[in-house]
Each structure stands twice: as C-alpha cells, then as structure tokens.
Amino acid sequence: MSNIKEIIESGKAFLGIEFGSTRIKAVLIDEEHNPIASGSHTWENRYENGLWTYSLDDIWTGLQDSYRDMAENVQKEYGVTIKKLGAIGFSAMMHGYMAFDKEGKLLAPFQTWRNSNTGKASEVLVDLFRYNIPLRWSIAHLYQCILDKEEHVKDIAFMTTLAGYIHWQMTGEKVLGVGDASGMFPIDMNTKDYDEEMIQKFDKLIEGENYPWKVKEILPKVLVAGDAAGILTEEGAKKLDPTGNLEAGIPLCPPEGDAGTGMVATNSVAQRTSNISAGTSFFSMVVLEKPLKDLHTEIDMVTTPDGSLVAMVHSNNGTTDLNAWVNLFKEFADSIGADVDMNQMYGTLYNKALEGDADCGGILSYGNYAGEPITNVEKGRPMVVRTPETKFTLANFMRSHLYTALGVIKVGMDILTKDEGVEIDTVLGHGGLFKTKGVGQKVLADAINTPVVVMETAGEGGPWGMAILAEYMVKRAEGEKLGDYLKNKVFGSNAGSRIDPDPEGVAGYEAFMETYKKGLDVERRACADL
C-alpha cells in the first residue's frame, strides 16, 4: 500500500475516464497497469424533441462526480490527495453530433449514436462514397442537418464527438484519436487521416449550399495512439476537479471511442486478431490486414487506436432471451420447492446444451427482442419452431438458444471469412455469454470455426483501456507498436484459456444456420402479423 501511496504522491499514476451510455467511470492505474482506484457516476440519456441526448450540465456533473468518487476512494484507501498524474485519457461512446460556433457555443442539442433519423443522409453518402456510412456516424448527422435545412449549419466552426469535446475543454486542442475519428468520417488506412477523395466528394456534394467552411476545416485533427495530444490547462483542471487539488500541466493522450478502448482492454489491436463482446447486445471486431474488396452494408468499418482497419459486426440482440428461459426454469424449480441459485441454474442449463445434438436436433429458435438490420428483421419476436420429427430435448432446446444468440454475428463473420477471405488467428470472447466456463466459448469457436480465448478477468473494461493508452503515450519505447506494448508489458503471461473448434460442432452449427436462414421469413411474418 505504501508503494501505491508513493506512486500517487509522486504523480506516476495514470487516469482513464470513459463515458458509457449509462455510466461514467474513472480508473486509476499504477506503473504496472494494475487498477488501483476507481469511481463512477450513473446517468441516463433523455429523449427530447424526437432525439436522444445528454445535456452539457449532465456531461460536466457526471465527469466531476466520477472523478470526485475516484479521488475520495484514493483518499480513503491510501490517505493521499491526487495533485499530479503521469497522463490522462478520455474516451466515450462514439459517433453522434456535437457542433459548435466560433465562440465555442453548442449550436444544437448533442445527438447521441442512438439517433436513427439520418436514413436519407446515410443512403446518399453510401452511394457517393461506395463505403458503408451507418446511421450513427457523425458525417451522416451533419449531412442530415444539411438536408433538413437546419439554420445552425452555416455557423459551424468545429464538430466533434463526446470524447473530443471533453478533451478540447481540458486542453484547448481540437484533436481526436483515429479510432474515434473513424466513426465520424472514413479514414484512409495509409495516411491514418480522413480519406481525401471522400472529403473532396463531400465538399462537392454540398457546394451549392455556399457554407463558409469546408468539411475538413470543421473536423478534429486525427492523432494515433502514442501521439502527444495536449496539456491540461488551468481551466481544464478546475473543470475536472473543482476542489482545485489537481494541478495543470498533466499530459493528455488522444481521446478515443469506446470501441478502441475495448480493443485495448481485451488485447485485440494486432492485425488478424478479433474480439467478440457478448452481453445484452453482441458485437465482433476483426482487425484487418487490408481493406475489404466490396461494400457490405452489414459491416461497419472503424480503426484501432493505432490506425489498423477494423471490420465491426453489430447485433442488437444478445443474451436477453436466453436469460428469460433460464428465469422460466428457475420459476419452475421454485414452484416445486427446489432450492437452486441462479449460478447453478445457468451452469446446469448451459452445460446441458453441450449434451445436445450438434445441429440442435432440428429445433429452430430466434431470440430477437429488438429488430436486426443485418437479417432484415424489423421488430423483436422471440420464437421457437419445430417439426413433429424434431428431437425435442432440454439439451437441444438450450443448445438452439445458445446457437441463435450468435446467429447475426455468424452472418456478418461469414461475409468476412468466406466472401472476403479475411484470416483470423484467434478471437477473444468477453461478456455474460462466457460466464459459465467453457460453454459459450465452445459454441462460439464452432460457430465461427476459429479458436476462442477467454481471459480469467477482463480488467476494468474501457476506462482501464483508456488509462493504458495514457500510459503507453508516456512509457512506450521508440517505435514500439501498441500491439507489442500490450502483449509484452500489459497482458504478459495472462494468455487466458483457449478452446479450438471441433469439426462435428462446426458442421452442426452450419446445418443449424441453413435452417436459421430459411426460417427468417417466418420471423419477418411474425413481425408483420403479430
């Protein structure tokens, strides 16, 4: 403890703060990248005038509260007041729209990534760029404002993301980490800057509007992990820590998006690696060696914090339906007086699934609680379908629900591995699906025919990843790549447990997917008719 106290007192600890959609979390780490203190603040987005937003007051109250909570925990645990830090990094939900005038005034309410009012803009930009521009991207929000003839657009001097905004207020620097920037506007993998050809196409598209700005002039400057990104100003220090204890002059690393910090926290920034987050919703990130050959609207393209191209597949649904079935069986157990806790219930039912037939005996299920753009399903309609010949056993039933939870991810991953020939060495799995040891991991390995690794701990997630990026900026050796730094200095011997795909399981999952694809019309009819 005295050692940690010295580290904090001498300003050698590193701080990462991440704005998630429901929680703002601050994580302080030591020189060995171990979390030594944390603090958090819970917040909720508001739905106002047809848009999802957070107010500036919410943002600043939340930031100060999460920092205060962390600083108080440090005081309580180690008896020391934080005055100096080795470096600070801010990260947040990506995409969305924050536009400011030349005085630094917010011109329109902050639009978060959740807003899907940008359909027309997205459609036009996909056609123009021949590159996927999802609804939540900042450039789609900007162009939708132009299409809607919004009065404020002519006055824009700067637009950025939430992390970029906080960083600007802390340092005065209008910069953004490449990972977060890649969710604003497409990035050129070679220059690690906005794609120049697309910049010119966009300027030409809007030239008739006669705005006093060109798009690159209002976007933040792109930086990569390890770059210096500014110094905490006196004003910034007071905004972060109103007590006045925190001193100005602390270096800041480039602000990043939550996708990038998640990749850092799971050691998945090197090319040919991938990570899959499997909780309430699922997403997979695959780090590519080269750009994809074709345009696929199912795949979002972003980058790692050091600028490698990443293909992202997102599924709106995840373990919600699985949890509902486990709860139903728990209710039955309670009804007959059986004393079974939830951990035992999950363990029993998930492990039972491994006893089932590799193709689930013909049982088909869908766990959609929300619509799925990738499979063209508009609403949530959880469903189980079987024929009289189906082998209707508990093992097959549970296996089909584990299989279907990964269905959308499988469709997207097949586009990458089968259509595009993308090669993946290992996938790192994290999230609720992997809590029951070995089960979700085996199902995923068979589904995507790739070895899956699960770490014993996933650290502190995104804010921990952001603190690591802050430390990397200060500590990296000359020319040391982020992937090497993570492998050698952060994760070291923590290789996790690995499960390889099993040929019978792979064939069984492929057979299940044939039925899954055929049954999608039934799911769509349920959306239309029920």
Where are these regions (language model features)?
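Active-site core segments that coordinate phosphate-bearing ligands/cofactors
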Residues: S2-G11, L15-G16, I82, K120-L176, ...
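Conserved beta-strand -> loop -> alpha-helix junction used to position metal-binding or nucleic-acid-contacting
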Residues: F110-K120
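A generic structural motif
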Residues: T42-W43, W113, N316
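N-terminal glycine/serine-rich phosphate-binding loop of ATP-dependent small-molecule kinases
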Residues: M1-A108, D155, K216, K238, ...
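Conserved small-residue
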Residues: A26-L28, H33, I88, N115, ...
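Short beta-strand-loop/turn "lid" adjacent to the catalytic site in phosphate-handling enzymes
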Residues: Q75-T112, N132-P134, H167-G179, G183-D188, ...
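Short glycine/proline- and acidic residue-enriched helix-loop micro-motifs
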Residues: W52, V126-R130, I218
